[in-house]
Each structure stands twice: as structure tokens, then as C-alpha cells.
Amino acid sequence: MSQYNFPDAKGHFGPYGGVFVAETLFGALDELKEAYAAAQADPAFRAEYEYELKHFVGRPSPIYHAKRWSEMLGGAQIYLKREDLNHTGAHKVNNCIGQAMLAKRMGKPRVIAETGAGQHGVATATVAARYGMECVVYMGSEDVKRQAANVYRMKLLGATVVPVESGSKTLKDALNEAMRDWVTNIHNTFYIIGTVAGPHPYPMLVRDFQKIIGEECLVQMPEMTGRQPDAVIACVGGGSNAMGIFYPYINVEGVRLIGVEAAGDGMETGRHSASLTAGVPGVLHGNRTYLLQDEDGQIIETHSVSAGLDYPGVGPEHAWLKDLGRAEYQPVTDSEALAAFHTLCRIEGIIPALESSHALAYAAKLAPTLAKDKILLVNLSGRGDKDMHTVAEKSGIVF
């Protein structure tokens, strides 16, 4: 592929991305773009970011060869990028630290965030505590119920959690409320968006703070295996963990990039969250991308066993990678993800997040079709502590 260089100056990834927001936000987005460009050019900012990643987050995260699982599947060797071992238990903190440092640099003492599974909310509350900032997290009331433990974590960390009762009471509604708050309190508030979506410069900025995942893999894989993997696999909701591991590999030839979407109860049922598999281009939350919408352009309600994948859109860069044919996107059902969750627990002693379990499930399908000398690298984007209640409930166990 010729050198990949996106987004353009206006935040477009081909026909996707851009800035579709109320005029009242243009100023704030321009201010953010300028502050980010200045921070990128400042070696002190980079040095502080790297220091925080090493000493606060615990990076680099290791890569683990899932030998027993690979043997059991009888095909390709599966390696796991262990983002679940980061402080706060997922990849989200990589981005939150970067944005909190930007907020501090811009003199904004208050940060807000939206969250689905609660992981981004916890990561935001964590960095707000670390930097002494006021923190408000918006969360769909449906997700507040599903993720009670994470809600309590956020409160312990000093954040105010606001349950959102509108719409489907999930991530997209939390995002709408967070946007409203930001418009009202632009003078003192920084909006820490948790995924590679939203208006420019967010998709670029979040990707840049997450690309540390793939950059580490580029160094670690040859050390472990003597070469780069044949395929990199990651789950895709909004898509920040996937973009973080994909981006450094885009110009590396011979490496397949496979994003795994939530097929929920099955693609044929309509109860899923697979916007790249079944969606059409449209505009939501400030950018143009693939969306799950009806004939009238109304967003349809999504479903996934995993709160973090339960979103009707996807980051615009994923939309562009799909159209370019550089990445492929595959759907995995709730039941397939749950099966992979249980298998990894028993075979490797690792409890994965339900989001990550979708990527694991696709790896389990793909590995047996490949030769034993092929290598699959799966981004294990988070740990499964937060999902204990959901998984137990599915198994008929009540705490």
C-alpha cells in the first residue's frame, strides 16, 4: 500500500470523519487542535507522557504466547497483547493520560467523559484524581445497572457519575449528554472522548495516544517470534483499541488487520452492533462514518452482551480502512464471545473482558484454518473483572 497518511488537515479519512457539530463548538475544537499541535511539537510533553505510561500505567504491556490454547486449536500460534495488565485494567488509560495532560496544558480544571462499559469512565476518573481535576462521567442508566462495580470505582476515585435516562440509555445517549455539558461549560471544561470517534481532531488524537500498543508490538513480536504476525486481530466498538494496534501496522506488508464486531444475537436477528458489517454511511456524534440506521436515517437500537461494543457507529478511520480494503471486519455473536471467554479462563488462566472475548472468538475460528507456523496477534484490550455479573447471570448464577 502506498504510504498511508490520514486524516487530512480538515480531519477527513477519505469521505469519513470531518466536523459535524453545532457552531458553538467550532472554537473549542480549533483551540484543541492548536493545543494538540503545540503539545506534539514539544519534547517535554512527549517525555512526560512516556514517563506516565511507564511509571503510572506500567508500560510496556507484555505479549504472551497462548501455547495451550494454540495447541488445543491445532493451527496458528496465538499471541496476546496484554492491555488487560495496564493500571485500571484496559487500554483506555493510554488515551486518558494524554488528554488529561492536554487539559492541564490548556488550563481546564474540569474534565468530562462518556462511558459504556465503565472502563473509560474509570480511566478518566483515575487520571483526574492523578492530576487533581474535577471529573463528571456520563453513563447510560442501562449501563449503570450492568456495570455497578465500575460505577462504584469511579465514585471512589472522586468522580460524579450522571446516569442518562434518554433514548436507549446506553453509550450513544451518554455521548449526547456529554456533548451538551461541553457546549455549556466550554470555558473551564475539557471533554475526554474515549474512542476514535467524534469530530476532528478527536479520532486522530485518540489514535495517536493509543498507537503505543502497536508500536510496542512492532518491537516485541520480532523479539519473541523472529518476525511480525500474519494477522492482527482486535475487537471494534468505537474502535480505539483496534486503531491503537492497527495503525503502526498499516504500512507493514503481509500483515492482515482484522477488526471484530459484535453480532449480538446473530446478524440475521437485527439485534447486534456490527456497523461496518451491516451499516451505511451517515453522520453521528460529529463525524461521518458507517452507522446502523433505518430507511429514514434514524439510529437503530443496538445490542451486545458487551457494553463497550454496544454502539451504533464506529471510528471514521475504520470506515476508511474497510473501504480501502486494508482492514477487514468480521462479526462475532454473544454466544461465541462467551465461549471464548470461558475457554481463555480455563486454558490460559486469564479472565478477559467480554469486548476482547470477541477478538479471541474470531482468533479461535481462524487459527485452525492456518498452518502451525502462522502467527496471530490478538489485542487483549481489557480484563474481565467488570463482566463477572454479566457472565454469571448468563450461566444462571446470581451473586
Swiss-Prot record:
The modification N6-(pyridoxal phosphate)lysine is found at K92. Pfam families: PALP (PF00291). It catalyses: (1S,2R)-1-C-(indol-3-yl)glycerol 3-phosphate + L-serine = D-glyceraldehyde 3-phosphate + L-tryptophan + H2O. Tetramer of two alpha and two beta chains. GO terms for cellular component: cytoplasm. Pathway: Amino-acid biosynthesis; L-tryptophan biosynthesis; L-tryptophan from chorismate: step 5/5. The beta subunit is responsible for the synthesis of L-tryptophan from indole and L-serine. The keyword Hydrolase does not apply. This is Tryptophan synthase beta chain.
